Amino acid sequence: IEQFRSPSLGELYTRRFSERLVDYHAEIFRSLIAAGVIYGGDTNALALMYVAPVITLIGVCDRQPERETECLEKLKSHVKQFYSMVHISVGNAR
């Protein structure tokens, strides 16, 4: 709640829980693209597509711990779907 009352806390929250995660994953995706493991593209967009559902599911678990099992299943499904979208199969480069 304080992040909405205090601009400095809101900025800190955004940096810590959004921007840093996106930047970190974008760098991982840049490395994977360079290595030919995943398809190329906008690494920041890939990072947002990957991280946003994770942040959402963590938020659900924080507010409703009894839904942890459900959220973990959704997370597994998300990771599998994301992987199938970006992974280059041997002999199947775009």
Protein language model regions, located:
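Short acidic/histidine-centered micro-motifs embedded in hydrophobic/aromatic stretches
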Residues: I1-E2, R16, M49, P53
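Amphipathic alpha-helical segments used for helix-helix packing
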Residues: I1-L12, G59-V60
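Residue-level preference for long, well-ordered alpha-helices that form the structural scaffold
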Residues: G10, T14, R67-C71, L75
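Short amphipathic alpha-helical interface segments enriched in basic and hydrophobic/aromatic residues
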Residues: A26, R30-I33, V51, I55-D62, ...
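Surface-exposed helix-capping loop/turn segments at secondary-structure junctions
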Residues: S31-G40, G91-A93
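Hydrophobic alpha-helical segments that form the core
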Residues: Y39-V60, E73-Q81
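C-terminal effector-binding regulatory domain of bacterial HTH transcription factors
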Residues: T69, S84-R94
